[in-house]
Amino acid sequence: MTQLNVVNDINHAGNWLIRNQELLLSYIINLISSIIILIIGFFAAKIISNLINKVLITQKIDTTIANFLAALVRYIIITFALIASLGCIGVQTTSVIAILGAAGMAIGLALQGSLSNFAAGVLLVILRPFRTGEYVNLEKISGTVLNIHVFYTTFRTLDGKIVVIPNGKIISGNIINYSREKARRNEFIIGVSYDSDIDKVIKILKNVVKNEKRVLKDRDIIVGLSELAPSSLNFIVRCWSHTDDINIVYWDLMVKFKKALDSNNINIPYPQFDINLKKKY
């Protein structure tokens, strides 16, 4: 009886296989397709992420950011490949996508501040309002850019302090870049006494600027009377120099203006006030 039962079971199994051979063949094909999609997805993710990493590094983008973006692209490709693979074997991908979406939303809410800083870091890399080594002003702080990281950027102030600022705060405020242009303009306000000869003062100030070798002669040099102040005639002087020389040129010209005015007996007045005293009888 036992041998007969075994034979019957084998016959039943064989008949079932014959009746359902198309269904089995379909399952096998779908399984193979699913495995192939996974393999292709993993290889594509690796190749594309490595390519992105190399391109970003050749563009002189911070290594940390380049690695992070490459890894992010890699995991996105693998996720899509996994969803497509599950779809091939009959899994309802809509439910999988819904679960992933809910998980992503929960993680996003938990890491809202960090994600905003990361997004700002990506924008800083793409838009490049400043680069490493440039001197910038960020409303409340000025300094040289040391490093641009994924979530924050470090600066060194003129007095040697290292300042770390989240990228979200940087991208949401005003950024003044003092180093991007090769040339910058200096502006001076020079006050002289009211009894000074206006034409003579303008000539003296122009000569001082023109004799300064570091002033760019192909840019406009402007000297003129800008204000009739309470205690002085205020002259404005504008000239251009290379960005690297901007501060030292300013300091040197201030000294030269003072010496030139002194040698021509032109006084730089102190603030004056008229006080009238009324005597009561």
Curated annotation (Swiss-Prot):
It is a multi-pass membrane protein. GO terms for cellular component: plasma membrane. NCBIfam families: PRK10334.1. The chain crosses the membrane at residues 23-45, 65-87, 94-116. Pfam families: MS_channel_1st (PF21088), MS_channel_1st_1 (PF05552), MS_channel_2nd (PF00924), MS_channel_3rd (PF21082). Its main location: membrane. InterPro entries: LSM_dom_sf, MS_channel_1st, MS_channel_C, MSC_TM_helix, MscS_archaea/bacteria_type, MscS_beta-dom_sf, MscS_channel_2nd, MscS_channel_C_sf. The keyword Transmembrane applies. One of its GO terms (molecular function) is mechanosensitive monoatomic ion channel activity. This is Uncharacterized MscS family protein bbp_402. Belongs to the MscS (TC 1.A.23) family. Keywords: Cell membrane, Membrane, Transmembrane, Transmembrane helix. It comes from the Bacteria. PANTHER family: SMALL-CONDUCTANCE MECHANOSENSITIVE CHANNEL. It is found in: Cell membrane. SUPFAM superfamilies: Mechanosensitive channel protein MscS (YggB), C-terminal domain (SSF82689), Mechanosensitive channel protein MscS (YggB), transmembrane region (SSF82861), Sm-like ribonucleoproteins (SSF50182).
